[in-house]
Amino acid sequence: MNPRGLFQDFNPSKFLIYACLLLFSVLLPLRLDGVIQWSYWAVFAPIWLWKLLVLAGASVGAGVWARNPRYRTEGEACVEFKAMLIAVGIHLLLLMFEVLVCDRVERGTHFWLLVFMPLFFVSPVSVAACVWGFRHDRSLELEILCSVNILQFIFIALRLDRIIHWPWLVVFVPLWILMSFLCLVVLYYIVWSLLFLRSLDVVAEQRRTHVTMAICWITIVVPLLIFEVLLVHRLDGHNMFSYISIFVPLWLSLITLMATTFRRKGGNHWWFGIRRDFCQFLLEIFPFLREYGNISYDLHHEDSEDAEETSAPEAPKIAPMFGKKARVVITQSPGKYVPPPPKLNIDMPD
């Protein structure tokens, strides 16, 4: 295990999102099954925490940007700052939708089409953000997710308002199309990992990378698909499973996504105005972490070294012997011990 390599590519933004979604996905089925009787405003607490950190990070980053004009010329600082502003705009629209959902569930006074209105606006904004992101080589997971699901948002809102009376299996047709594409991606990674395993011209590091990617995609997509199928059957009345058991596959997918954030490069350096990698920022604030971060463990390598030391022990080192009169240093070789020659006195004639 190499902690330095583990945290060097850590993406704190995605880790925060997946952690908040995991906690929310635990509280929501507990509330739906009646295990807890909290208000939905409290159930959505992880979502409020997520949005609060986004707004706080953007505010601090904007303040650092405004007070230090010299920072704007550092590499791609301008591009990253614009990407942060786009992300904040999308998060604000999502926050409006989540507030309207809580208000609709608690009071039930307005139509679901009005509740989904922020999502109808976020989709074209996400399309524009995707175009801008492709031009500047930016990460686009959230933007792509919001842009491709516009039809799904419309179907769900119409079904909740009973404008259409389709079964939920039909309502989620856009989602099935998206999941079919993700299944093709999983199949692609599986095939490539098998080809790399059978190839003799590929180094072991590349084989491990492709196998790891295939396993990650399988543990993300397959449980997610199982969760969606169980949820649709529960909404249509084909099964009476508890919501807790239905959400278990989703927890597995989110935990896998959290694990992948430790090996994913990226992340905007302008959140909270840190302007550097999150790992370097933590090491500057907490210097004692460097002692752990500079340690690497390789048990297999240590075992091989122990075997080599056991098979070929090092010859003992013998201290050098010094002559008192001649002041000559005699260093003995690591072979057989040979005594020095006897002292010879030469008498000079008068």
Swiss-Prot record:
Keyword Membrane attributed: yes
Stored Pfam families: Tmemb_185A (PF10269)
InterPro entries listed in its UniProt record: TM_Fragile-X-F-assoc
Chief localisation class: membrane
GO cellular component: membrane
Transmembrane regions listed in the UniProt entry: 16-36, 41-61, 81-101, 111-131, 168-188, 211-231, 240-260
Subcellular localization, as worded in the UniProt entry: Membrane
Keyword entries, A-Z: Membrane, Transmembrane, Transmembrane helix
Membrane topology: Multi-pass membrane protein
Family indicated by similarity: Belongs to the TMEM185 family.
PANTHER family for the chain: FAM11A, B PROTEIN, TRANSMEMBRANE PROTEIN 185B
Record protein name field: Transmembrane protein 185B
